[in-house]
């Protein structure tokens, strides 16, 4: 699937600004960004729900609407409604009947883990149960591409864990998966690749490890006797805080910082804490200005698995 220099505005607000994004088949991609970054608009463009003002969207080399009609795409959007006053089984049977080659119902039920809900009326589902049914509807057609917009927003911790178990089952079958989420640990654990949007543009694109290395700082913690102000001048150190007698050094080159500390010999209880995805996300989204190119170049981080063609 791909977006090519896609632009979309709503009145004076440019939600997507010249966005280019290509996803190979079989990849699980997480789309991240703060509120208003353009995630939902980008997904709507890919699905053909709204047309771009300029640029192009394509799924499997086809116009999105055509790929959707062929049953190659399953989507779970934030606003997806459910038919009321029918049972879950009746709803899924109806949805399956709209596809030329649907996934067997027992497989849908197993993937979504909704076996205990089949006899329940849709209008009596909890928010989390309704989300699981929406996921089941998204995979009824045995799609090649599954698009999920904030899929675990209404789920508790255990339900989220079960959801991702089911989704990884799809990924293991070679399905392409695109999801947006505010739970950064989900992106860290589940995505082969992460794209961070800001002001409708790509500001970072790569694996979780690549983005963390490129965008975030490692924390070096030490206990030092006496005046600690000199620690701020060590190689790599960009920020220092003293908390409860320990210095917390935010370093862009932790190896150089640690070597300098070891050479000084005046420190103890040395601890190096690698950056996590949340650190990188905050660094990227708090510094990316709306009108200049991204500080972390997508071309420098993008990794496309060998031999994979685009979805």
Regions found by a protein language model. Name each.
Residues 47, 55-69:
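Conserved ABC transporter NBD signature motif
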Residues 93, 97, 103-118:
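Conserved ABC ATPase "signature" region
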Residues 146-150:
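Catalytic Walker B motif of ABC-type/P-loop ATPase nucleotide-binding domains
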